[in-house]
Swiss-Prot record:
Lineage of source species: Bacteria, Pseudomonadati, Thermodesulfobacteriota, Desulfuromonadia, Desulfuromonadales
Transmembrane parts of this sequence: 9-29
Location within or outside the cell: Cell inner membrane
Name of the protein: ATP synthase subunit b
The protein's assembly and partners: F-type ATPases have 2 components, F(1) - the catalytic core - and F(0) - the membrane proton channel. F(1) has five subunits: alpha(3), beta(3), gamma(1), delta(1), epsilon(1). F(0) has three main subunits: a(1), b(2) and c(10-14). The alpha and beta chains form an alternating ring which encloses part of the gamma chain. F(1) is attached to F(0) by a central stalk formed by the gamma and epsilon chains, while a peripheral stalk is formed by the delta and b chains.
Organism superkingdom: Bacteria
Bilayer topology: Single-pass membrane protein
Record carries keyword Transmembrane helix: yes
Function per UniProt: F(1)F(0) ATP synthase produces ATP from ADP in the presence of a proton or sodium gradient. F-type ATPases consist of two structural domains, F(1) containing the extramembraneous catalytic core and F(0) containing the membrane proton channel, linked together by a central stalk and a peripheral stalk. During catalysis, ATP synthesis in the catalytic domain of F(1) is coupled via a rotary mechanism of the central stalk subunits to proton translocation.
């Protein structure tokens, strides 16, 4: 759709064409009327030539005005297209910058999350390491405690056996003395046997 100035120019051109047509028609009509009273063909040709020249000049001016209006219209349309292209380019640039900011923010957020996950994994790994070390120490202490208890139990068992054997020998020695049949050799034999058994339970 044309602008108000384009419509005004077109209307002016139409009026100019109408004026030219009316002027030419009037000239031809007057020439035909005068032809009945005048016989000077040279004057008629001269007048007709001037009228044709005037018409040619007016037609040239009219053509120039029309061409100028078309060029102006084309330039206006070109300017509108350029302005629209510039606006679209600016909008595209703004949209691209917005996307860049969004992606930059997302990338920064993802980097922070990755760093946080890495820190959490390192902390969990260190905690798991400490837990395993603590469990290993507890197991070693438990084994050592069980070994100590087992050794103490064996010592107590050996002591009990030694005490029982010592009691048995004492009873046997007492019985022999009571019987009056023990001699020095038998006494030494009993003592040596007792000492050997004591050495075995150490």
């Amino acid at each position: 759709m044309g602008t108000p100035s384009d419509r005004t120019t077109t209307l002016s051109l139409c009026l100019a064409v109408c004026v030219v047509v009316i002027a030419v028609g009037t000239g031809w009509a007057s020439e035909a009327g005068e032809g009945a009273h005048q016989v000077d063909s040279a004057a008629q040709m001269k007048d007709f030539g001037w009228r044709v020249l005037n018409f040619a000049v007016l037609a040239a001016l009219l053509g120039w005005a029309i061409a100028k209006a078309q060029v102006k219209k084309a330039l206006n349309e070109r300017q509108v297209k350029i302005e629209r292209s510039l606006r679209e380019a600016e909008q595209s640039r703004d949209a691209a910058e917005q996307k860049l900011r969004e992606y930059s923010g997302k990338l920064e957020h993802a980097s922070r999350e990755i760093e946080e996950m890495r820190g959490a994994m390192l902390r969990e790994s260190e905690q798991e390491k400490q837990r395993i070390i603590a469990e290993a120490r507890a197991a070693a202490e438990k084994i050592a405690g069980q070994a100590t208890l087992s050794a103490e139990h064996e010592v107590l068992k050996a002591r009990s056996a030694l005490q029982a054997e010592a009691g048995r020998l004492a009873v046997q020695l007492a019985a022999t003395k009571l019987a009056g049949a023990i001699g020095k050799e038998d006494h030494d034999l009993y003592v040596d046997d007792y000492l050997k058994k004591v050495e075995q339970f150490k």
